[in-house]
Amino acid sequence: MPWLQVRLAISPEQAETYEDALLEVGAVSVTFMDAEDQPIFEPDLNTTPLWSHTHLLALFEADTQPEAVFAHLQLLTGHDLPEHQAEVIEDQDWERSWMDNFQPMRFGQRLWIVPSWHEAPEKDAVNLLLDPGLAFGTGTHPTTALCLEWLDGQQLEGTQVLDFGCGSGILAIAALLLGAREAVGTDIDVQALEASRDNAQRNGIADDLFALYLPEHMPAMQADVLVANILAGPLVSLAPQLSGLVRPGGLLALSGILAEQGEEVAAAYAADFELDPIVVRDGWVRISGRRR
């Protein structure tokens, strides 16, 4: 059966207001979509991932009049509507259509991220199986891509890798598949640790090779390699702690940092690390270096 699809171009601040209003006027489903190809690999768990430019899609029964929907939305919100449109769409196999949007992606020279329903493009490559979901977006978010490419470029054989703020575990799992001896992941959210364990098992990684801890339970350690794809504020405030978690001569890679925040974060680590040039991509940066 056909459906009426209504699309609104909104900001994150408008999301809740328009979601509630659409449901009140009879939408049978409401979906948030990225308007500018800014997929999120590792959003905060228990949150709805929103982008700086978001499309809100709502489906209505086919006989719904779009003019009536827009009039009611304006009345309910008390504001002029943002950019909007309506169209009639035909029913389809939504699950298959959704799956077709996700293709294997390559990071660096060896590493691929491969959805479970796809054949690995290169059988002899390092293939990390990860299905789309909250921990996997429609493309390559610059921060996660920068970290994955950095890991791909390191000699990780025999190393211990710490993934600080592990989220889905994607960085630690990639490090293990690239040759790390063992990995440690830590996150403030128990659900993130559970997701990391599930993803590790899907990739054939034994539990004893990938230890997972809440921060307060993490043992004292100094890793050979530390990766942290979190936010600039915590990276600055935690700089003494993170620096102490890397052994002398060990490696560090940080992301989740906007370009304008790069110098501030780098300055917080400059005393303890010989830093590489900052790498910038699409307004995000990666900071890496070697412990003095």
Curated annotation (Swiss-Prot):
Q: Which Gene3D superfamilies match?
A: Vaccinia Virus protein VP39 (3.40.50.150)
Tell me which family the UniProt entry assigns to this protein: Belongs to the methyltransferase superfamily. PrmA family.
EC number(s) recorded for this UniProt protein: 2.1.1.-
Spell out the molecular function terms from Gene Ontology: protein-lysine N-methyltransferase activity
Cellular component annotations (GO), alphabetically ordered: cytosol
* Name of the protein described by the UniProt record: Ribosomal protein L11 methyltransferase
Reactions catalysed according to its record: L-lysyl-[protein] + 3 S-adenosyl-L-methionine = N(6),N(6),N(6)-trimethyl-L-lysyl-[protein] + 3 S-adenosyl-L-homocysteine + 3 H(+)
Q: Which domain of life is it from?
A: Bacteria
Biological process according to GO: methylation
Q: Which NCBIfam families match?
A: prmA (TIGR00406)
Per UniProt, subcellular location reads as:
Cytoplasm
UniProt keyword terms in alphabetical order: Cytoplasm, Methyltransferase, S-adenosyl-L-methionine, Transferase
Annotated residues for binding of S-adenosyl-L-methionine: T144, G165, D187, N229
Record's function text: Methylates ribosomal protein L11.
Claim: Methyltransferase is one of the keywords in the record: yes
Pfam families found in the cross-reference section: PrmA
| Organism per entry | Pseudomonas entomophila (strain L48)
